[in-house]
From Swiss-Prot:
Region listing for Hydrophobic dimerization interface, in residue ranges: 153-163
GO CC annotation terms, alphabetical: mitochondrion
Protein name: Peptide deformylase, mitochondrial
Annotated source species: Mus musculus (Mouse)
Active-site residue list: E203
Cofactor needs: Co(2+)
Cited function: Removes the formyl group from the N-terminal Met of newly synthesized proteins.
Family of this protein: Belongs to the polypeptide deformylase family.
The keyword Transit peptide belongs to this UniProt entry's keyword annotation: yes
Domain of life the protein comes from: Eukaryota
Disulfide bonds: none
Biological-process GO terms, alphabetical: positive regulation of cell population proliferation; post-translational protein modification; translation
Amino acid sequence: MLLLGRLPRPAWVPGSRAQRCSSLAALEGPARTRSYWRYLRRLVCGAPQPPYAHVCQVGDPVLRVVAAPVEPEQLAGPELQRLVGRMVQVMRRRGCVGLSAPQLGVPLQVLALEFPDKLLRAFSPRLRELRQMEPFPLRVLVNPSLRVLDSRLVTFPEGCESVAGFLACVPRFQAVQISGLDPKGEPVVWSASGWTARIIQHEMDHLQGCLFIDKMDSGTFTNLHWMEVND
């Protein structure tokens, strides 16, 4: 399991603003204190270890790492199966349509994707048609690669469990083909278009340390709760 340490602090220059507030400290923000019960739980149980039962948030270094391929000897092994099981569990609990291993703190090339009918029904018929939404069953891909089938760019809003509470318009290719292995090491090839192609591209980006905010139209970046703030 790869453990990531803290980011190195920037060089201290006498007489500079770094004496008063380093850029890293400014990024980290004020110190966060734990509740007594959280402290006791951590003391007794230890720190959580990946794969987490939560989704890592933007700012976590693991989301900016290029994920490593799963080695052949790891295929069908207990660690990979545990990772896949946790990914599916978290994805379904969060009600999202895709999740990558880095989002649970594991920088490996593993994706889980699923768009069940119950999530599709949350969208109006008009939006389903406009965004070319179709349900698909659970698919897990190991060491996936992507090929563009239709290079036309289509722009729609999307969000991410690792940038919780925000969305923005992002251009994506109309159709792609993803190929890789299933958790047992069997080859998988999947061609998709429309919204399914968007989901695939979004999750593939995670394996390259890329988030949707890197490709978004920044003028459309939206806090989903902005209206509540004004109430």
